[in-house]
Protein backbone atom coordinates (compact mmCIF):
# COMPACT_ATOMS: atom_id res chain seq x y z
CA UNK A 1 0.00 0.00 0.00
CA UNK A 2 1.19 3.50 -0.70
CA UNK A 3 0.41 7.18 -0.75
CA UNK A 4 0.92 9.53 -3.67
CA UNK A 5 -0.36 12.69 -5.31
CA UNK A 6 -4.16 12.94 -5.67
CA UNK A 7 -5.32 10.64 -8.47
CA UNK A 8 -7.24 12.22 -11.30
CA UNK A 9 -5.70 15.68 -10.86
CA UNK A 10 -4.26 17.58 -13.80
CA UNK A 11 -0.77 16.44 -12.87
CA UNK A 12 -1.55 12.78 -12.36
CA UNK A 13 -3.84 10.29 -14.00
CA UNK A 14 -5.91 7.41 -12.78
CA UNK A 15 -4.38 4.53 -14.73
CA UNK A 16 -6.76 1.69 -15.60
CA UNK A 17 -4.83 -1.50 -16.35
CA UNK A 18 -6.72 -3.95 -18.56
CA UNK A 19 -5.48 -6.98 -20.39
CA UNK A 20 -8.26 -9.52 -20.96
CA UNK A 21 -11.86 -9.39 -22.11
CA UNK A 22 -13.49 -9.48 -18.64
CA UNK A 23 -11.34 -6.50 -17.62
CA UNK A 24 -12.75 -4.41 -20.46
CA UNK A 25 -16.34 -5.13 -19.47
CA UNK A 26 -15.66 -4.19 -15.83
CA UNK A 27 -13.63 -1.09 -16.65
CA UNK A 28 -16.12 0.49 -19.06
CA UNK A 29 -18.59 1.87 -16.46
CA UNK A 30 -15.78 3.05 -14.17
CA UNK A 31 -14.01 4.91 -16.96
CA UNK A 32 -17.33 6.43 -18.04
CA UNK A 33 -18.26 7.59 -14.53
CA UNK A 34 -14.86 9.15 -13.93
CA UNK A 35 -14.94 10.82 -17.35
CA UNK A 36 -18.22 12.46 -16.38
CA UNK A 37 -16.48 13.82 -13.27
CA UNK A 38 -13.67 15.29 -15.34
CA UNK A 39 -10.99 12.98 -14.00
CA UNK A 40 -7.69 12.69 -15.83
CA UNK A 41 -7.42 9.04 -16.91
CA UNK A 42 -5.07 6.80 -18.80
CA UNK A 43 -6.05 3.37 -20.16
CA UNK A 44 -3.16 0.91 -20.23
CA UNK A 45 -3.80 -2.22 -22.30
CA UNK A 46 -1.24 -4.90 -21.52
CA UNK A 47 -2.03 -6.94 -24.62
CA UNK A 48 -2.62 -10.12 -22.62
CA UNK A 49 -5.43 -10.83 -25.09
CA UNK A 50 -3.72 -9.91 -28.34
CA UNK A 51 -6.12 -11.23 -31.00
CA UNK A 52 -8.53 -8.61 -32.40
CA UNK A 53 -11.44 -10.97 -31.78
CA UNK A 54 -10.38 -11.26 -28.14
CA UNK A 55 -9.56 -7.62 -27.50
CA UNK A 56 -10.06 -4.74 -29.94
CA UNK A 57 -13.63 -5.72 -30.78
CA UNK A 58 -14.50 -5.39 -27.09
CA UNK A 59 -13.25 -1.80 -27.00
CA UNK A 60 -15.45 -1.01 -29.99
CA UNK A 61 -18.51 -2.75 -28.55
CA UNK A 62 -18.16 -1.09 -25.14
CA UNK A 63 -17.33 2.40 -26.32
CA UNK A 64 -14.07 2.42 -24.38
CA UNK A 65 -11.52 5.00 -25.45
CA UNK A 66 -8.63 3.74 -27.51
CA UNK A 67 -5.94 2.69 -25.03
CA UNK A 68 -3.25 5.28 -24.43
CA UNK A 69 -0.71 2.50 -24.66
CA UNK A 70 -0.71 -1.17 -25.65
CA UNK A 71 2.18 -3.07 -24.11
CA UNK A 72 1.67 -5.98 -26.52
CA UNK A 73 2.79 -8.62 -24.04
CA UNK A 74 0.83 -11.51 -25.55
CA UNK A 75 0.80 -15.07 -24.28
CA UNK A 76 3.36 -17.17 -22.42
CA UNK A 77 3.77 -19.27 -19.32
CA UNK A 78 2.54 -17.70 -16.09
CA UNK A 79 6.08 -16.78 -15.07
CA UNK A 80 7.12 -15.47 -18.48
CA UNK A 81 3.92 -13.51 -19.02
CA UNK A 82 3.83 -12.02 -15.52
CA UNK A 83 7.50 -11.02 -15.76
CA UNK A 84 6.96 -9.37 -19.15
CA UNK A 85 3.90 -7.57 -17.81
CA UNK A 86 5.85 -6.24 -14.84
CA UNK A 87 8.70 -4.99 -17.01
CA UNK A 88 6.31 -3.23 -19.38
CA UNK A 89 4.18 -1.76 -16.60
CA UNK A 90 7.20 -0.52 -14.65
CA UNK A 91 8.36 1.34 -17.75
CA UNK A 92 4.87 2.76 -18.29
CA UNK A 93 4.39 3.89 -14.68
CA UNK A 94 7.88 5.40 -14.56
CA UNK A 95 7.39 7.39 -17.75
CA UNK A 96 3.77 8.35 -16.94
CA UNK A 97 3.52 8.30 -13.15
CA UNK A 98 -0.12 7.74 -12.16
CA UNK A 99 -1.78 9.01 -9.01
CA UNK A 100 -3.72 5.76 -8.73
CA UNK A 101 -3.64 2.41 -10.49
CA UNK A 102 -7.00 0.67 -10.86
CA UNK A 103 -6.89 -3.06 -11.57
CA UNK A 104 -9.75 -5.38 -12.44
CA UNK A 105 -10.51 -9.03 -11.77
CA UNK A 106 -7.90 -11.74 -11.37
CA UNK A 107 -5.81 -12.16 -14.51
CA UNK A 108 -2.01 -11.95 -14.64
CA UNK A 109 -2.22 -8.29 -15.72
CA UNK A 110 -4.07 -7.57 -12.48
CA UNK A 111 -1.46 -8.92 -10.09
CA UNK A 112 1.45 -7.65 -12.19
CA UNK A 113 0.10 -4.10 -12.10
CA UNK A 114 -0.55 -4.28 -8.36
CA UNK A 115 2.98 -5.50 -7.67
CA UNK A 116 4.62 -2.85 -9.83
CA UNK A 117 2.48 0.01 -8.52
CA UNK A 118 3.04 -0.97 -4.89
CA UNK A 119 6.81 -1.17 -5.38
CA UNK A 120 6.78 2.28 -7.00
CA UNK A 121 4.75 3.77 -4.15
CA UNK A 122 1.60 4.29 -6.24
CA UNK A 123 -1.78 3.51 -4.62
CA UNK A 124 -3.75 0.55 -5.96
CA UNK A 125 -7.51 0.05 -6.21
CA UNK A 126 -8.84 -3.44 -6.93
CA UNK A 127 -12.24 -3.77 -8.57
CA UNK A 128 -13.80 -7.16 -7.75
CA UNK A 129 -11.85 -7.64 -4.52
CA UNK A 130 -12.48 -10.40 -2.00
CA UNK A 131 -13.73 -13.14 -4.30
CA UNK A 132 -12.45 -16.52 -3.14
CA UNK A 133 -12.77 -20.05 -4.47
CA UNK A 134 -10.39 -21.33 -1.74
CA UNK A 135 -8.75 -23.41 -4.45
CA UNK A 136 -5.07 -22.53 -4.69
CA UNK A 137 -4.64 -24.76 -7.73
CA UNK A 138 -6.32 -21.94 -9.67
CA UNK A 139 -3.84 -19.27 -10.81
CA UNK A 140 -6.64 -16.71 -10.51
CA UNK A 141 -7.05 -17.44 -6.80
CA UNK A 142 -3.39 -16.64 -6.16
CA UNK A 143 -3.71 -13.44 -8.20
CA UNK A 144 -6.77 -12.37 -6.20
CA UNK A 145 -5.18 -12.94 -2.80
CA UNK A 146 -1.94 -11.13 -3.65
CA UNK A 147 -3.71 -8.20 -5.30
CA UNK A 148 -6.04 -7.63 -2.35
CA UNK A 149 -3.16 -7.50 0.11
CA UNK A 150 -1.44 -4.85 -2.00
CA UNK A 151 -4.54 -2.71 -2.56
CA UNK A 152 -5.31 0.56 -0.80
CA UNK A 153 -8.93 0.33 -1.95
CA UNK A 154 -10.83 -2.95 -2.26
CA UNK A 155 -14.09 -2.68 -4.21
CA UNK A 156 -16.26 -5.71 -3.41
CA UNK A 157 -19.12 -6.98 -5.54
CA UNK A 158 -20.94 -8.97 -2.82
CA UNK A 159 -21.22 -9.16 0.98
CA UNK A 160 -19.38 -12.48 1.31
CA UNK A 161 -16.36 -10.90 -0.39
CA UNK A 162 -16.18 -8.37 2.44
CA UNK A 163 -16.16 -11.23 4.93
CA UNK A 164 -13.25 -12.87 3.12
CA UNK A 165 -11.23 -9.66 3.21
CA UNK A 166 -11.93 -9.20 6.92
CA UNK A 167 -10.81 -12.76 7.63
CA UNK A 168 -7.53 -12.00 5.85
CA UNK A 169 -6.88 -8.92 7.96
CA UNK A 170 -7.79 -6.25 5.42
CA UNK A 171 -8.76 -3.07 7.29
CA UNK A 172 -12.47 -2.21 6.92
CA UNK A 173 -11.64 1.36 5.90
CA UNK A 174 -10.04 -0.02 2.73
CA UNK A 175 -13.14 -2.02 1.74
CA UNK A 176 -16.22 -0.76 -0.10
CA UNK A 177 -19.29 -2.73 -1.21
CA UNK A 178 -20.10 -1.23 -4.60
CA UNK A 179 -21.96 -3.90 -6.56
CA UNK A 180 -20.84 -5.35 -9.86
CA UNK A 181 -19.58 -3.12 -12.69
CA UNK A 182 -19.87 -6.03 -15.14
CA UNK A 183 -23.61 -5.87 -14.52
CA UNK A 184 -23.56 -2.11 -15.17
CA UNK A 185 -22.32 -2.91 -18.66
CA UNK A 186 -24.88 -5.67 -19.11
CA UNK A 187 -27.85 -3.56 -18.00
CA UNK A 188 -26.66 -0.58 -20.02
CA UNK A 189 -26.66 -2.63 -23.22
CA UNK A 190 -29.76 -4.80 -22.80
CA UNK A 191 -31.44 -3.37 -25.89
CA UNK A 192 -28.33 -4.21 -27.96
CA UNK A 193 -28.31 -7.95 -27.16
CA UNK A 194 -30.50 -9.09 -30.06
CA UNK A 195 -30.65 -12.88 -29.83
CA UNK A 196 -33.06 -13.18 -32.76
CA UNK A 197 -30.85 -11.12 -35.07
CA UNK A 198 -27.79 -13.15 -34.06
CA UNK A 199 -29.67 -16.40 -34.64
CA UNK A 200 -30.64 -15.26 -38.14
CA UNK A 201 -27.18 -13.90 -39.02
CA UNK A 202 -25.32 -17.02 -37.89
CA UNK A 203 -28.08 -19.44 -38.93
CA UNK A 204 -28.38 -20.84 -35.42
CA UNK A 205 -31.08 -23.31 -34.38
CA UNK A 206 -34.14 -22.05 -32.54
CA UNK A 207 -33.25 -23.97 -29.38
CA UNK A 208 -29.64 -24.44 -28.36
CA UNK A 209 -27.25 -24.80 -25.44
CA UNK A 210 -24.41 -22.26 -25.44
CA UNK A 211 -21.04 -23.53 -24.24
CA UNK A 212 -17.81 -21.74 -23.40
CA UNK A 213 -14.79 -23.41 -21.81
CA UNK A 214 -11.29 -22.05 -21.36
CA UNK A 215 -9.89 -22.83 -17.89
CA UNK A 216 -6.70 -24.92 -17.75
CA UNK A 217 -8.34 -27.68 -15.71
CA UNK A 218 -10.82 -28.23 -18.54
CA UNK A 219 -8.82 -27.61 -21.71
CA UNK A 220 -5.13 -28.33 -21.03
CA UNK A 221 -5.36 -32.07 -20.31
CA UNK A 222 -6.10 -34.12 -23.46
CA UNK A 223 -7.93 -36.78 -21.43
CA UNK A 224 -10.20 -34.15 -19.87
CA UNK A 225 -10.86 -32.64 -23.28
CA UNK A 226 -11.75 -36.07 -24.67
CA UNK A 227 -14.22 -36.71 -21.83
CA UNK A 228 -15.77 -33.26 -22.17
CA UNK A 229 -16.10 -33.78 -25.91
CA UNK A 230 -17.94 -37.03 -25.29
CA UNK A 231 -20.27 -35.34 -22.79
CA UNK A 232 -20.96 -32.42 -25.13
CA UNK A 233 -21.80 -34.88 -27.90
CA UNK A 234 -24.31 -36.42 -25.48
CA UNK A 235 -25.68 -32.96 -24.72
CA UNK A 236 -26.12 -32.48 -28.47
CA UNK A 237 -28.55 -35.39 -28.45
CA UNK A 238 -30.77 -33.26 -26.17
CA UNK A 239 -30.31 -29.89 -27.89
CA UNK A 240 -27.98 -28.29 -30.41
CA UNK A 241 -24.72 -27.06 -28.89
CA UNK A 242 -23.26 -23.73 -30.00
CA UNK A 243 -19.74 -23.02 -28.75
CA UNK A 244 -17.51 -20.03 -29.48
CA UNK A 245 -14.07 -21.62 -29.16
CA UNK A 246 -11.53 -19.79 -27.04
CA UNK A 247 -8.05 -19.80 -28.64
CA UNK A 248 -6.68 -21.53 -25.54
CA UNK A 249 -8.73 -24.66 -26.19
CA UNK A 250 -9.20 -24.64 -29.95
CA UNK A 251 -6.45 -27.09 -30.91
CA UNK A 252 -7.37 -29.53 -28.15
CA UNK A 253 -11.07 -29.59 -29.04
CA UNK A 254 -10.23 -29.91 -32.74
CA UNK A 255 -8.06 -32.96 -32.01
CA UNK A 256 -10.82 -34.47 -29.89
CA UNK A 257 -13.34 -34.05 -32.73
CA UNK A 258 -15.80 -31.83 -30.88
CA UNK A 259 -17.11 -30.34 -34.11
CA UNK A 260 -17.65 -33.74 -35.73
CA UNK A 261 -21.13 -34.11 -34.24
CA UNK A 262 -23.77 -32.75 -36.64
CA UNK A 263 -25.54 -30.84 -33.85
CA UNK A 264 -22.40 -29.16 -32.48
CA UNK A 265 -21.68 -25.75 -34.01
CA UNK A 266 -18.25 -24.26 -33.32
CA UNK A 267 -17.83 -20.51 -33.75
CA UNK A 268 -14.90 -18.13 -33.80
CA UNK A 269 -14.63 -15.95 -30.66
CA UNK A 270 -17.44 -13.40 -30.51
CA UNK A 271 -17.44 -9.75 -29.51
CA UNK A 272 -19.17 -8.70 -26.32
CA UNK A 273 -22.54 -7.82 -27.83
CA UNK A 274 -22.77 -11.00 -29.89
CA UNK A 275 -21.61 -13.22 -27.03
CA UNK A 276 -24.19 -11.90 -24.58
CA UNK A 277 -26.86 -12.14 -27.30
CA UNK A 278 -25.86 -15.79 -27.74
CA UNK A 279 -26.17 -16.32 -23.98
CA UNK A 280 -29.49 -14.49 -23.79
CA UNK A 281 -31.00 -16.64 -26.53
CA UNK A 282 -29.80 -19.96 -25.09
CA UNK A 283 -31.99 -22.53 -23.38
CA UNK A 284 -29.06 -23.11 -21.00
CA UNK A 285 -25.35 -22.36 -20.75
CA UNK A 286 -22.43 -24.67 -19.98
CA UNK A 287 -19.36 -22.73 -18.85
CA UNK A 288 -16.32 -22.44 -16.62
CA UNK A 289 -16.29 -18.62 -16.82
CA UNK A 290 -16.87 -16.48 -13.75
CA UNK A 291 -18.30 -13.61 -15.76
CA UNK A 292 -20.82 -15.84 -17.53
CA UNK A 293 -22.05 -17.07 -14.13
CA UNK A 294 -22.83 -13.44 -13.28
CA UNK A 295 -24.39 -12.51 -16.61
CA UNK A 296 -26.73 -15.52 -16.65
CA UNK A 297 -27.85 -14.61 -13.12
CA UNK A 298 -29.21 -11.31 -14.43
CA UNK A 299 -30.46 -12.70 -17.76
CA UNK A 300 -32.32 -15.57 -16.04
CA UNK A 301 -30.67 -18.28 -18.14
CA UNK A 302 -29.87 -21.63 -16.44
CA UNK A 303 -26.10 -21.89 -16.01
CA UNK A 304 -24.15 -25.11 -15.45
CA UNK A 305 -20.60 -24.41 -14.31
CA UNK A 306 -18.08 -27.17 -14.99
CA UNK A 307 -15.98 -26.56 -11.91
CA UNK A 308 -15.73 -28.04 -8.40
CA UNK A 309 -16.04 -24.58 -6.84
CA UNK A 310 -16.80 -20.97 -7.61
CA UNK A 311 -15.53 -17.68 -6.25
CA UNK A 312 -18.98 -16.29 -7.04
CA UNK A 313 -21.34 -18.23 -4.72
CA UNK A 314 -23.85 -15.39 -4.93
CA UNK A 315 -24.67 -16.69 -8.43
CA UNK A 316 -25.80 -19.93 -6.80
CA UNK A 317 -27.66 -18.46 -3.81
CA UNK A 318 -29.26 -15.62 -5.78
CA UNK A 319 -28.92 -16.62 -9.42
CA UNK A 320 -29.32 -19.40 -11.93
CA UNK A 321 -25.93 -21.05 -11.48
CA UNK A 322 -25.25 -24.65 -10.50
CA UNK A 323 -21.89 -26.42 -10.15
CA UNK A 324 -21.64 -29.67 -12.10
CA UNK A 325 -19.04 -32.31 -12.83
CA UNK A 326 -18.32 -33.83 -16.20
CA UNK A 327 -20.05 -37.00 -14.97
CA UNK A 328 -23.36 -35.35 -14.05
CA UNK A 329 -23.43 -32.68 -16.77
CA UNK A 330 -25.86 -34.41 -19.12
CA UNK A 331 -28.39 -35.44 -16.46
CA UNK A 332 -28.36 -31.98 -14.87
CA UNK A 333 -28.70 -30.25 -18.21
CA UNK A 334 -31.63 -32.49 -19.10
CA UNK A 335 -33.40 -31.24 -15.96
CA UNK A 336 -32.54 -27.64 -16.79
CA UNK A 337 -33.93 -27.95 -20.31
CA UNK A 338 -37.15 -29.37 -18.88
CA UNK A 339 -37.42 -26.57 -16.32
CA UNK A 340 -36.86 -28.94 -13.41
CA UNK A 341 -34.18 -26.84 -11.69
CA UNK A 342 -35.04 -24.22 -9.09
CA UNK A 343 -33.60 -21.20 -10.85
CA UNK A 344 -34.29 -18.64 -8.07
CA UNK A 345 -35.19 -16.13 -10.77
CA UNK A 346 -35.67 -12.50 -9.82
CA UNK A 347 -33.53 -12.55 -6.68
CA UNK A 348 -30.89 -10.05 -7.79
CA UNK A 349 -27.74 -9.80 -5.65
CA UNK A 350 -27.41 -6.62 -3.57
CA UNK A 351 -26.36 -3.50 -5.49
CA UNK A 352 -26.27 -5.26 -8.86
CA UNK A 353 -28.33 -2.34 -10.11
CA UNK A 354 -26.28 -0.69 -12.83
CA UNK A 355 -24.71 1.97 -10.59
CA UNK A 356 -21.47 0.30 -9.50
CA UNK A 357 -19.30 2.46 -11.73
CA UNK A 358 -20.74 5.58 -10.10
CA UNK A 359 -20.06 4.21 -6.63
CA UNK A 360 -16.47 3.38 -7.51
CA UNK A 361 -15.92 6.80 -9.09
CA UNK A 362 -17.38 8.45 -5.99
CA UNK A 363 -14.97 6.63 -3.68
CA UNK A 364 -11.99 7.36 -5.91
CA UNK A 365 -12.93 11.03 -6.03
CA UNK A 366 -13.36 11.28 -2.24
CA UNK A 367 -10.16 9.33 -1.63
CA UNK A 368 -8.15 11.78 -3.71
CA UNK A 369 -9.13 14.80 -1.64
Task: Put a short name on every predicted segment.
Residues 241:
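Glycine-rich, Lys/Arg-enriched anion-binding loops that position phosphate/diphosphate groups
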Residues 2-238, 249-369:
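Nucleotide-activated sugar donor-binding and catalytic core shared by glycosyltransferases
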Amino acid sequence: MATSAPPGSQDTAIAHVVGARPNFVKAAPVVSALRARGAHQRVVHTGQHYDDRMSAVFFRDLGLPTPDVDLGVGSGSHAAQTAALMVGLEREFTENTPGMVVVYGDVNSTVAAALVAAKLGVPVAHVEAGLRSFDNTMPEEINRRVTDQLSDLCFATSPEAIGHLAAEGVSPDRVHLVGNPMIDTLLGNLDRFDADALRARLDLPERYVAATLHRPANVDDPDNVARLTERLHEVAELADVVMPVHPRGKAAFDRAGLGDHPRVRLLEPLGYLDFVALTRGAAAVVTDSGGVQEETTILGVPCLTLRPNTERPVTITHGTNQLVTEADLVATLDKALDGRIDERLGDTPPLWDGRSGERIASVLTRWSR
